[in-house]
């Protein structure tokens, strides 16, 4: 599972030590940690810091290095050096790669050292200032919506680039029915593509929104019941490779506020197995992958 701890920079959210303890108690033998810290994990020293902080932990920690310097989406980070220091993949956590050529070059370059590139499935120009799924509920509640199209366009672009460049690409936390279909077709073509789904997208929908509970403000947003059913089918059929907790604790000052002002993110390590097991036969999932 991929997680976001606060250290370094946001220790008030969660330290590495506490996060690893929670992961171990929740049954995880290994986790991948995102680069969304301060400073961002975009160099070998930062990768080594994370590994050194976890040497005696029961749960193994695998760092995901930032794809770009400072996760700003402009200049590529030190991918090779981070890989040599222990980074298992490269991603600007929950930030789309807007520059098409940047992703193209990253996919080409990473092939030199068997690197794995993540591309977050969101087209910002389509998503705009949306904060929830665009649909009946967003209209009824007067909340700005994010069209599912924002996810589909980004994934389609990524797949075209991957077909051109070769290499390995991972699409994290897909959230729609059409995304499952797009990746299914790409796998049929033989592209080296994997994807994940956040556990909460398997059992929560945008029907939770009328209470304006900021715990349900996540990125990608909660979608429809039809999407949830398709995601579950994607898991059991093997199209979706990973179920992730997308554990991202937010401090109370930034979460217990007006819905539109709250930061995206929710905790997920403690509840993940029980929640997933309530909607998916885990034996069936293991056999599928």
Task: Indicate where each model-derived feature is located.
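N-terminal small/glycine-rich loop or linker at the start of catalytic domains
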Residues: 1-6, 204-216
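Hard-cation-handling environments
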Residues: 175-206, 233-245, 249-250
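Short acidic/polar active-site loop segments enriched in Thr and Asp
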Residues: 28-30, 88, 241
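Divalent metal-coordination and catalytic microenvironments
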Residues: 2, 23, 27, 61, ...
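A conserved active-site cap/scaffold subdomain adjacent to cofactor or substrate pockets
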Residues: 166-168, 209-244
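His/Asp/Glu-enriched, well-ordered alpha-helical/loop segment
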Residues: 140-166, 236-237, 242-243, 248-289
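Histidine/acidic-residue-rich, glycine-tolerant segments that coordinate divalent metal ions
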Residues: 37-49, 54-165, 178-182, 202-209
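Metal-associated gating/positioning segment near the N- to mid-region
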Residues: 1-54
């Amino acid at each position: 599972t991929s997680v976001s701890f606060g250290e370094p920079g946001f220790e008030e959210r969660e330290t590495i030590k506490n996060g690893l303890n929670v992961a171990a108690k929740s049954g995880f033998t290994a986790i991948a940690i995102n680069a969304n810290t301060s400073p961002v994990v975009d160099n070998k020293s930062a990768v080594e810091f994370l590994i050194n902080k976890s040497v005696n932990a029961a749960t193994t920690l695998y760092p995901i290095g930032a794809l770009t310097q400072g996760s700003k989406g402009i200049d590529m980070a030190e991918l090779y050096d981070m890989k040599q220091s222990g980074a298992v993949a490269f991603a600007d956590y929950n930030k789309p790669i807007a520059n098409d050529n940047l992703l193209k070059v990253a996919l080409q370059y990473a092939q030199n050292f068997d690197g794995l590139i993540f591309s977050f499935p969101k087209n910002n120009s389509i998503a705009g200032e949306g904060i929830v799924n665009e649909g009946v509920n967003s209209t009824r509640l007067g909340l700005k919506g994010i069209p599912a199209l924002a996810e589909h366009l980004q994934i389609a672009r990524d797949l075209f680039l991957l077909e051109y460049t070769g290499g390995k690409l991972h699409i994290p936390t897909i959230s729609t029915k059409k995304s499952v279909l797009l990746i299914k077709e790409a796998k049929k073509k033989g592209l080296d593509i994997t994807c994940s789904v956040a556990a909460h997208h398997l059992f929560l929908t945008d029907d939770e929104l009328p209470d304006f509970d900021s715990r349900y403000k996540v990125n990608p947003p909660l979608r429809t019941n039809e999407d949830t059913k398709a995601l579950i089918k994607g898991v059991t059929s093997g199209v979706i490779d990973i179920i992730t907790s997308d554990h991202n604790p937010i401090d109370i000052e930034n979460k217990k506020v007006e819905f539109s002002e709250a930061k995206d993110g929710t905790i997920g390590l403690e509840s993940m197995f029980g929640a997933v097991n309530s909607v998916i036969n885990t034996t069936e999932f293991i056999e599928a992958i």
